[in-house]
C-alpha cells in the first residue's frame, strides 16, 4: 500500500535504535526523507548510511543532538526549520521504587520525556498548520493507562503525553494536521533481547522458546505471548503519518499485545 508520503520530511527523535529506528526505516520505505536523531554522532551516522543504502531514493540526514538541552534544540531548529512529520520517540525509563524517586529524578524524567517533545512540537506545529499538512506522533506506553507500579516516574510522563496530544489536537481543527499518541506494549528492543538471552544463557533453547518462557513467567497477561516487534510499531506509525489517517485526531492508539485488560 502506497502511503503517499513521498518526499515528505520527518524528524524521528531517538532513532538510532529500537522503536525509533524502526519508525525511521518504515518512513524511508515510503519515500520520506528522515532526520535521524541521537546523541552519539557515530550511531547517527551509521543509521543514516544504513537507511540510505536500503532506500537510495531518499535523503536521510544527521540530526545529532541532545534534545533535552535547549541550546542544542535551537541549533537543530536553525538547521532544519521545517518538517512535515514529527515523531517524539525519545525517552528514558528505569525500574525504580517510589521511595527511590527523588525530586531530581522527577525533574529529569519530566524534562526528557515531556518537555523536550513539547518544545519540538511547539516549534514545528505552526509551520504544519500554515502548510495545512503535518503529523505529530507522541510515543507513550501501555504504562500510561495501566501503571505497573515499578516505575512511577516513567508512567507519569507517559500519561502526560496522552493529555498533551489531546490538548494540542484542538489547535488543528479544520486542518490536515493530526496529533496522536501510540502506546506500545512490551517491545523487543536490542536491550530486551540481550536481557532475555542472559536469563536463559545456560538453557538449550531457541530464542523463540526463551521468549515464550519469559512471557509466561513475567507477562502472563499478554495475549500474544511474545514481544511486539519494532517493525510492527514502525508500520503503524507510517500509516498514521499518511493522508489515509487524517481522521485520527488526538487519539491514544494502543498496540499493546492485549496487555491492557480494559476496553478504554
Q: What are the language-model segments listed below?
A:
Residues 126, 170-171, 246:
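Alpha-helical segment proximal to the catalytic Tyr-Lys
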Residues 6, 146, 238, 249-264:
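Short C-terminal tail/terminal secondary-structure segment
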Residues 97-98, 102-110, 218:
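Substrate-binding pocket helix/loop in short-chain dehydrogenase/reductase
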Residues 9, 16-17:
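Conserved glycine-rich cofactor-binding loop
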Residues 173, 178, 248-250:
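Short, small/polar-rich loop/turn modules that mediate ligand/substrate recognition or access, typified
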Residues 141:
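Residue(s) in the substrate-gating loop at a strand-loop-helix junction
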Residues 121, 157, 165:
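Active-site helix of classical SDR
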Amino acid at each position: 500500500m502506497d502511503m503517499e508520503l513521498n518526499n515528505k520530511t520527518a524528524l524521528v527523535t531517538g532513532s538510532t535504535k529500537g522503536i525509533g529506528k524502526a519508525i525511521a526505516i518504515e518512513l524511508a520505505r515510503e519515500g520520506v526523507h528522515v532526520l535521524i536523531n541521537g546523541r552519539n554522532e557515530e550511531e547517527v551516522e551509521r543509521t543514516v548510511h544504513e537507511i540510505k543504502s536500503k532506500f537510495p531514493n531518499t535523503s536521510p540526514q544527521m540530526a545529532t543532538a541532545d534534545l533535552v538541552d535547549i541550546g542544542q534544540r535551537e541549533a537543530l531548529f536553525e538547521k532544519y526549520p521545517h518538517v512535515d512529520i514529527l515523531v517524539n520517540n525519545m525517552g528514558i525509563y528505569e525500574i525504580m521504587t517510589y521511595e527511590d524517586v527523588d525530586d531530581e529524578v522527577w525533574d529529569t524524567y519530566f524534562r526528557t520525556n515531556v518537555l523536550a517533545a513539547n518544545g519540538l512540537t511547539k516549534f514545528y506545529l505552526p509551520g504544519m498548520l500554515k502548510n495545512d499538512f503535518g503529523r505529530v506522533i507522541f510515543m507513550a506506553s501501555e504504562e500510561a493507562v495501566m501503571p505497573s507500579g515499578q516505575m512511577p516516574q516513567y508512567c507519569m510522563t507517559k500519561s502526560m503525553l496522552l493529555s498533551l496530544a489531546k490538548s494540542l489536537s484542538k489547535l488543528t481543527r479544520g486542518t490536515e494536521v493530526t496529533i496522536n499518541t501510540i502506546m506500545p506494549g512490551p517491545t523487543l528492543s536490542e536491550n530486551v533481547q540481550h536481557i532475555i538471552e542472559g536469563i536463559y544463557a545456560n538453557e538449550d533453547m531457541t530464542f523463540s522458546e526463551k521468549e515464550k518462557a519469559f512471557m509466561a513467567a513475567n507477562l502472563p497477561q499478554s495475549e500474544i505471548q511474545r514481544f511486539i516487534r519494532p517493525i510492527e510499531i514502525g508500520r503503524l506509525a507510517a500509516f498514521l503519518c499518511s493522508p489515509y489517517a487524517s481522521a485520527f485526531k488526538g487519539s491514544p492508539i494502543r498496540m499493546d499485545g492485549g496487555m491492557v485488560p480494559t476496553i478504554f
